[in-house]
Amino acid sequence: MTQESNSNFFNFLLFGFVTAIAFYSGTQFNKSSEQEEHINHANLYSVKKFDDGAKEYSIMLITDLDHDSKDGKKWKSLVSRGFLKVSADHKHADIHFDKDSEYYVDTNIAAGGRAMELSDLAVFNGKLYSIDDRTGLIYQISDKKALPWVLLNDGPGNVVKGFKGEWITVKDTELIVGGLGKEWTTTDGVYVNDHPMWVKHVSAHGAVHHENWKDVYIRVRRAAGIEYPGYMIHEAVQWSAIHRKWFFLPRRMSNEKYSEAEDENRGTNVLVIGNEELTDFEVVRVGSENNKSRGFAAFQFVPNTHHQLIVAIKSEEKDGKPVASYASVFDIHGNVILDEYLLHGPYKYEGIAFA
Protein backbone atom coordinates (compact mmCIF):
# COMPACT_ATOMS: atom_id res chain seq x y z
CA MET A 1 0.00 0.00 0.00
CA THR A 2 1.42 3.40 -0.96
CA GLN A 3 2.00 6.24 1.50
CA GLU A 4 -0.88 8.18 -0.08
CA SER A 5 -3.15 5.13 0.23
CA ASN A 6 -2.19 4.79 3.89
CA SER A 7 -3.09 8.43 4.46
CA ASN A 8 -6.43 8.09 2.68
CA PHE A 9 -7.24 4.91 4.59
CA PHE A 10 -6.40 6.62 7.88
CA ASN A 11 -8.65 9.57 6.99
CA PHE A 12 -11.42 7.12 6.12
CA LEU A 13 -11.09 5.38 9.48
CA LEU A 14 -11.11 8.68 11.34
CA PHE A 15 -14.16 9.92 9.48
CA GLY A 16 -15.93 6.61 10.10
CA PHE A 17 -15.13 6.83 13.81
CA VAL A 18 -16.57 10.34 14.07
CA THR A 19 -19.63 9.26 12.06
CA ALA A 20 -20.23 6.44 14.54
CA ILE A 21 -20.04 8.90 17.42
CA ALA A 22 -22.51 11.21 15.69
CA PHE A 23 -24.88 8.29 15.03
CA TYR A 24 -24.71 7.26 18.67
CA SER A 25 -25.44 10.83 19.73
CA GLY A 26 -28.48 10.84 17.47
CA THR A 27 -29.81 7.63 19.02
CA GLN A 28 -29.64 9.31 22.39
CA PHE A 29 -31.89 12.19 21.27
CA ASN A 30 -35.08 10.89 22.87
CA LYS A 31 -33.29 10.00 26.09
CA SER A 32 -31.53 13.34 26.42
CA SER A 33 -34.60 15.34 25.39
CA GLU A 34 -36.49 13.84 28.30
CA GLN A 35 -33.92 15.24 30.69
CA GLU A 36 -33.87 18.86 31.71
CA GLU A 37 -31.12 20.72 29.88
CA HIS A 38 -28.69 22.55 32.13
CA ILE A 39 -26.72 25.05 30.06
CA ASN A 40 -23.58 26.82 31.18
CA HIS A 41 -24.05 30.49 30.25
CA ALA A 42 -20.55 31.59 31.28
CA ASN A 43 -18.82 34.16 29.09
CA LEU A 44 -15.41 33.36 27.64
CA TYR A 45 -14.23 36.90 26.92
CA SER A 46 -12.17 39.26 29.05
CA VAL A 47 -13.19 42.90 29.53
CA LYS A 48 -11.06 45.91 30.43
CA LYS A 49 -12.74 49.01 31.85
CA PHE A 50 -11.37 52.54 31.34
CA ASP A 51 -11.79 55.66 33.47
CA ASP A 52 -13.93 57.32 30.80
CA GLY A 53 -16.40 54.44 30.87
CA ALA A 54 -15.15 52.75 27.70
CA LYS A 55 -14.86 48.96 27.66
CA GLU A 56 -12.51 46.73 25.70
CA TYR A 57 -13.46 43.13 24.94
CA SER A 58 -11.32 40.23 23.76
CA ILE A 59 -12.39 38.79 20.42
CA MET A 60 -11.44 35.79 18.33
CA LEU A 61 -11.66 35.41 14.54
CA ILE A 62 -11.32 32.26 12.48
CA THR A 63 -10.57 31.76 8.79
CA ASP A 64 -11.80 29.64 5.92
CA LEU A 65 -8.62 29.16 3.87
CA ASP A 66 -10.40 27.10 1.18
CA HIS A 67 -7.81 25.19 -0.90
CA ASP A 68 -4.97 26.77 1.08
CA SER A 69 -6.09 24.90 4.19
CA LYS A 70 -4.17 21.83 2.95
CA ASP A 71 -0.85 21.54 4.77
CA GLY A 72 0.93 18.30 3.98
CA LYS A 73 -1.16 15.49 5.43
CA LYS A 74 -3.28 17.86 7.51
CA TRP A 75 -5.72 20.72 7.01
CA LYS A 76 -5.52 23.94 8.99
CA SER A 77 -7.37 27.15 9.87
CA LEU A 78 -5.85 30.39 11.13
CA VAL A 79 -7.10 31.81 14.44
CA SER A 80 -6.56 35.51 15.18
CA ARG A 81 -7.09 37.26 18.50
CA GLY A 82 -7.73 40.93 19.15
CA PHE A 83 -9.75 43.51 21.04
CA LEU A 84 -12.85 45.61 20.41
CA LYS A 85 -13.07 48.88 22.36
CA VAL A 86 -16.42 50.67 22.66
CA SER A 87 -16.97 54.11 24.17
CA ALA A 88 -19.33 54.62 27.10
CA ASP A 89 -21.93 56.34 24.89
CA HIS A 90 -21.65 53.60 22.24
CA LYS A 91 -20.84 56.23 19.60
CA HIS A 92 -17.25 55.20 18.91
CA ALA A 93 -15.44 51.89 18.47
CA ASP A 94 -11.97 50.65 17.65
CA ILE A 95 -10.47 47.26 16.80
CA HIS A 96 -6.88 46.09 17.04
CA PHE A 97 -5.18 42.71 16.83
CA ASP A 98 -2.24 40.98 18.45
CA LYS A 99 -0.34 39.26 15.62
CA ASP A 100 1.83 37.43 18.15
CA SER A 101 -1.24 35.57 19.41
CA GLU A 102 -2.16 34.04 16.04
CA TYR A 103 -2.10 30.28 15.74
CA TYR A 104 -3.40 27.43 13.59
CA VAL A 105 -5.77 24.63 14.47
CA ASP A 106 -5.61 21.51 12.33
CA THR A 107 -7.21 18.14 11.62
CA ASN A 108 -6.63 14.84 9.80
CA ILE A 109 -10.33 14.39 9.01
CA ALA A 110 -11.28 15.42 5.47
CA ALA A 111 -13.97 14.93 2.84
CA GLY A 112 -13.09 14.93 -0.83
CA GLY A 113 -9.56 16.02 -0.01
CA ARG A 114 -10.69 19.21 1.75
CA ALA A 115 -11.27 20.14 5.39
CA MET A 116 -10.90 22.71 8.15
CA GLU A 117 -12.76 25.36 6.13
CA LEU A 118 -14.29 26.77 9.29
CA SER A 119 -17.41 28.93 9.23
CA ASP A 120 -18.57 31.03 12.18
CA LEU A 121 -17.94 30.74 15.91
CA ALA A 122 -20.35 30.39 18.80
CA VAL A 123 -20.05 30.16 22.57
CA PHE A 124 -22.42 27.43 23.75
CA ASN A 125 -22.63 25.69 27.11
CA GLY A 126 -19.42 27.35 28.25
CA LYS A 127 -17.43 26.16 25.22
CA LEU A 128 -16.37 27.64 21.88
CA TYR A 129 -17.52 25.88 18.71
CA SER A 130 -17.02 26.18 14.96
CA ILE A 131 -18.23 24.20 11.94
CA ASP A 132 -16.25 22.85 9.00
CA ASP A 133 -18.35 23.54 5.91
CA ARG A 134 -16.61 20.71 4.02
CA THR A 135 -17.03 17.77 6.38
CA GLY A 136 -20.02 18.94 8.44
CA LEU A 137 -18.03 18.45 11.64
CA ILE A 138 -18.63 20.75 14.59
CA TYR A 139 -15.35 21.36 16.40
CA GLN A 140 -14.75 22.59 19.90
CA ILE A 141 -11.89 25.11 19.85
CA SER A 142 -9.92 24.64 23.05
CA ASP A 143 -6.27 25.02 24.10
CA LYS A 144 -5.26 25.85 20.51
CA LYS A 145 -6.78 22.60 19.28
CA ALA A 146 -9.84 21.69 17.20
CA LEU A 147 -11.65 18.80 18.89
CA PRO A 148 -14.32 16.95 16.82
CA TRP A 149 -17.68 16.97 18.60
CA VAL A 150 -20.69 16.27 16.36
CA LEU A 151 -21.06 15.33 12.69
CA LEU A 152 -23.94 16.96 10.79
CA ASN A 153 -25.32 15.29 7.67
CA ASP A 154 -26.62 17.38 4.79
CA GLY A 155 -30.27 18.20 4.12
CA PRO A 156 -32.80 16.15 6.11
CA GLY A 157 -29.97 14.17 7.68
CA ASN A 158 -30.39 10.95 5.71
CA VAL A 159 -27.65 11.57 3.15
CA VAL A 160 -23.95 10.66 3.17
CA LYS A 161 -22.61 14.14 2.44
CA GLY A 162 -21.64 16.38 5.35
CA PHE A 163 -23.68 19.53 5.98
CA LYS A 164 -22.25 22.75 4.53
CA GLY A 165 -22.77 24.75 7.71
CA GLU A 166 -22.31 28.50 7.28
CA TRP A 167 -23.72 30.09 10.44
CA ILE A 168 -24.15 29.17 14.10
CA THR A 169 -26.24 30.74 16.82
CA VAL A 170 -27.55 29.84 20.26
CA LYS A 171 -31.27 29.87 21.09
CA ASP A 172 -32.31 28.89 24.60
CA THR A 173 -30.74 25.46 25.22
CA GLU A 174 -29.75 24.64 21.64
CA LEU A 175 -26.95 25.35 19.22
CA ILE A 176 -28.52 26.04 15.83
CA VAL A 177 -26.49 25.58 12.66
CA GLY A 178 -27.64 26.78 9.25
CA GLY A 179 -26.47 26.58 5.66
CA LEU A 180 -26.48 28.99 2.73
CA GLY A 181 -30.26 29.35 2.89
CA LYS A 182 -30.80 29.09 -0.86
CA GLU A 183 -31.57 26.28 -3.24
CA TRP A 184 -28.48 24.28 -4.21
CA THR A 185 -27.86 24.89 -7.89
CA THR A 186 -25.22 24.36 -10.53
CA THR A 187 -22.75 27.18 -11.21
CA ASP A 188 -25.23 28.43 -13.81
CA GLY A 189 -28.21 28.46 -11.46
CA VAL A 190 -29.90 25.18 -12.42
CA TYR A 191 -31.82 23.75 -9.45
CA VAL A 192 -30.41 20.62 -7.76
CA ASN A 193 -31.97 20.34 -4.26
CA ASP A 194 -33.03 22.20 -1.11
CA HIS A 195 -30.40 20.77 1.24
CA PRO A 196 -28.83 24.16 2.16
CA MET A 197 -32.26 25.30 3.39
CA TRP A 198 -32.28 22.92 6.36
CA VAL A 199 -31.06 23.86 9.85
CA LYS A 200 -29.70 21.64 12.60
CA HIS A 201 -30.69 21.87 16.27
CA VAL A 202 -27.93 20.48 18.49
CA SER A 203 -28.44 19.87 22.20
CA ALA A 204 -25.76 20.24 24.85
CA HIS A 205 -25.52 16.43 24.79
CA GLY A 206 -24.81 16.42 21.04
CA ALA A 207 -28.23 15.14 19.92
CA VAL A 208 -29.23 16.50 16.50
CA HIS A 209 -32.67 17.42 15.17
CA HIS A 210 -33.10 18.44 11.52
CA GLU A 211 -35.61 21.14 10.52
CA ASN A 212 -36.65 22.31 7.06
CA TRP A 213 -36.37 26.10 6.88
CA LYS A 214 -37.23 26.49 3.19
CA ASP A 215 -40.36 28.52 3.92
CA VAL A 216 -38.43 30.66 6.41
CA TYR A 217 -35.68 31.52 3.94
CA ILE A 218 -38.27 32.32 1.27
CA ARG A 219 -39.99 34.75 3.65
CA VAL A 220 -36.66 36.37 4.57
CA ARG A 221 -35.69 37.09 0.98
CA ARG A 222 -39.23 38.10 0.08
CA ALA A 223 -39.05 40.79 2.78
CA ALA A 224 -36.17 42.32 0.77
CA GLY A 225 -38.10 42.03 -2.49
CA ILE A 226 -36.37 38.89 -3.76
CA GLU A 227 -38.35 36.12 -5.47
CA TYR A 228 -37.07 32.89 -7.02
CA PRO A 229 -35.09 32.43 -9.24
CA GLY A 230 -33.57 35.40 -7.43
CA TYR A 231 -31.72 34.39 -4.30
CA MET A 232 -30.22 35.39 -0.98
CA ILE A 233 -27.14 33.71 0.54
CA HIS A 234 -26.71 33.57 4.32
CA GLU A 235 -23.53 33.19 6.35
CA ALA A 236 -24.43 35.53 9.24
CA VAL A 237 -27.53 34.78 11.33
CA GLN A 238 -28.04 35.34 15.06
CA TRP A 239 -30.85 34.88 17.55
CA SER A 240 -31.21 37.65 20.15
CA ALA A 241 -32.48 36.44 23.51
CA ILE A 242 -32.89 40.08 24.56
CA HIS A 243 -35.08 41.18 21.65
CA ARG A 244 -36.54 37.68 21.14
CA LYS A 245 -35.93 38.23 17.44
CA TRP A 246 -33.87 36.79 14.60
CA PHE A 247 -31.23 38.89 12.83
CA PHE A 248 -29.97 38.12 9.31
CA LEU A 249 -27.09 39.86 7.51
CA PRO A 250 -27.23 38.32 4.01
CA ARG A 251 -23.92 37.82 2.25
CA ARG A 252 -25.29 38.06 -1.29
CA MET A 253 -28.63 38.78 -2.88
CA SER A 254 -29.97 39.33 -6.36
CA ASN A 255 -33.21 39.38 -8.32
CA GLU A 256 -31.36 37.45 -11.02
CA LYS A 257 -30.81 33.70 -10.89
CA TYR A 258 -27.59 32.46 -9.33
CA SER A 259 -24.43 32.67 -11.40
CA GLU A 260 -21.06 31.80 -9.92
CA ALA A 261 -19.40 34.33 -12.24
CA GLU A 262 -21.67 37.18 -11.09
CA ASP A 263 -22.15 36.23 -7.45
CA GLU A 264 -18.91 37.81 -6.20
CA ASN A 265 -20.34 41.25 -6.98
CA ARG A 266 -23.73 40.84 -5.33
CA GLY A 267 -22.80 41.76 -1.75
CA THR A 268 -25.34 43.49 0.48
CA ASN A 269 -25.68 46.11 3.20
CA VAL A 270 -29.03 44.74 4.36
CA LEU A 271 -30.11 43.68 7.86
CA VAL A 272 -33.31 41.63 8.06
CA ILE A 273 -34.95 41.35 11.49
CA GLY A 274 -37.64 38.73 12.10
CA ASN A 275 -39.94 37.91 14.99
CA GLU A 276 -39.48 34.71 17.00
CA GLU A 277 -41.98 32.83 14.83
CA LEU A 278 -40.15 33.99 11.68
CA THR A 279 -43.38 35.21 10.12
CA ASP A 280 -42.90 38.99 10.22
CA PHE A 281 -39.81 40.89 9.06
CA GLU A 282 -38.37 44.36 8.75
CA VAL A 283 -35.48 45.40 6.51
CA VAL A 284 -32.80 47.85 7.65
CA ARG A 285 -30.11 49.40 5.44
CA VAL A 286 -26.67 49.45 7.06
CA GLY A 287 -24.90 52.72 6.24
CA SER A 288 -25.21 54.64 2.99
CA GLU A 289 -22.52 52.92 0.92
CA ASN A 290 -22.47 49.39 -0.40
CA ASN A 291 -19.36 47.90 -1.97
CA LYS A 292 -20.95 44.94 -3.73
CA SER A 293 -17.71 42.97 -3.84
CA ARG A 294 -17.89 42.61 -0.04
CA GLY A 295 -20.40 40.37 1.69
CA PHE A 296 -21.25 39.67 5.32
CA ALA A 297 -19.57 36.53 6.68
CA ALA A 298 -20.32 36.68 10.42
CA PHE A 299 -21.45 38.92 13.27
CA GLN A 300 -22.05 39.04 17.00
CA PHE A 301 -23.90 41.38 19.34
CA VAL A 302 -21.51 43.49 21.39
CA PRO A 303 -21.76 42.64 25.13
CA ASN A 304 -23.32 45.11 27.55
CA THR A 305 -25.13 47.04 24.79
CA HIS A 306 -28.52 45.32 25.21
CA HIS A 307 -27.97 43.86 21.73
CA GLN A 308 -28.11 47.34 20.23
CA LEU A 309 -24.60 47.16 18.72
CA ILE A 310 -23.30 44.63 16.22
CA VAL A 311 -19.72 43.84 15.22
CA ALA A 312 -19.66 42.26 11.77
CA ILE A 313 -17.15 40.77 9.37
CA LYS A 314 -17.30 41.17 5.60
CA SER A 315 -15.03 39.33 3.20
CA GLU A 316 -14.10 39.89 -0.42
CA GLU A 317 -13.20 37.33 -3.08
CA LYS A 318 -11.94 37.53 -6.66
CA ASP A 319 -12.20 34.56 -9.00
CA GLY A 320 -12.88 32.31 -6.02
CA LYS A 321 -9.81 33.41 -4.07
CA PRO A 322 -9.89 35.51 -0.86
CA VAL A 323 -8.77 39.12 -1.24
CA ALA A 324 -9.43 40.72 2.14
CA SER A 325 -11.76 40.90 5.14
CA TYR A 326 -13.20 43.91 6.96
CA ALA A 327 -14.68 44.55 10.41
CA SER A 328 -17.38 47.10 11.16
CA VAL A 329 -19.57 48.14 14.07
CA PHE A 330 -23.11 49.48 13.69
CA ASP A 331 -26.37 49.58 15.60
CA ILE A 332 -29.51 47.60 14.79
CA HIS A 333 -30.98 50.68 13.11
CA GLY A 334 -28.20 50.71 10.53
CA ASN A 335 -26.13 53.59 11.93
CA VAL A 336 -22.43 52.88 11.41
CA ILE A 337 -20.13 53.37 14.42
CA LEU A 338 -16.94 51.94 12.89
CA ASP A 339 -16.74 51.77 9.11
CA GLU A 340 -15.24 48.79 7.32
CA TYR A 341 -11.83 48.33 8.92
CA LEU A 342 -9.34 46.34 6.84
CA LEU A 343 -8.14 43.24 8.66
CA HIS A 344 -4.58 42.10 8.09
CA GLY A 345 -3.76 39.47 5.51
CA PRO A 346 -5.50 38.22 2.35
CA TYR A 347 -7.74 35.97 4.41
CA LYS A 348 -11.43 35.16 4.37
CA TYR A 349 -12.46 35.50 8.01
CA GLU A 350 -15.75 33.68 8.53
CA GLY A 351 -16.23 33.62 12.28
CA ILE A 352 -16.06 36.06 15.17
CA ALA A 353 -16.72 35.51 18.86
CA PHE A 354 -16.19 37.30 22.14
CA ALA A 355 -13.71 34.89 23.67
Swiss-Prot record:
Pfam family, one: Apyrase
Coarse class of the protein's main subcellular location: membrane
List of residues binding Ca(2+): S119, E166, E235, E350
Keyword check for Transferase: no
Gene ablation phenotype (knockout): RNAi-mediated knockdown causes a 50% reduction of progeny numbers and a slower growth. RNAi-mediated knockdown at the L4 larval stage results in a reduced lifespan and in the lysosomal accumulation of lipofuscin in the intestine with age. Motility is decreased and muscle sarcomeres are often patched or wrinkled.
Coiled-coil residue spans: none
Catalytic activity annotation: a ribonucleoside 5'-diphosphate + H2O = a ribonucleoside 5'-phosphate + phosphate + H(+)
Keywords noted in UniProt: Calcium, Glycoprotein, Hydrolase, Membrane, Metal-binding, Signal-anchor, Stress response, Transmembrane, Transmembrane helix
SUPFAM superfamilies: Apyrase
Cofactor(s) the protein requires to work: Ca(2+)
EC number of the protein: 3.6.1.6
Inducing stimuli: By ER stress.
GO molecular-function terms, A-Z: calcium ion binding; GDP phosphatase activity; UDP phosphatase activity
Superkingdom: Eukaryota
Bilayer-spanning residue ranges: 7-29
Residues listed as glycosylation sites in the UniProt record: N30, N291
Topology with respect to the bilayer: Single-pass type II membrane protein
GO CC annotations, alphabetized: endomembrane system; membrane
Signal peptide: none
Known function: Hydrolyzes UDP and to a lesser extent GDP. By preventing the accumulation of NDP, may promote the reglucosylation of incompletely folded glycoproteins in the endoplasmic reticulum following the unfolded protein response.
Family that this chain belongs to: Belongs to the apyrase family.
Record-linked PANTHER family: APYRASE (PTHR13023), SOLUBLE CALCIUM-ACTIVATED NUCLEOTIDASE 1 (PTHR13023:SF3)
Protein name: Apyrase apy-1
Originating organism: Caenorhabditis elegans
Gene this chain is encoded by: apy-1
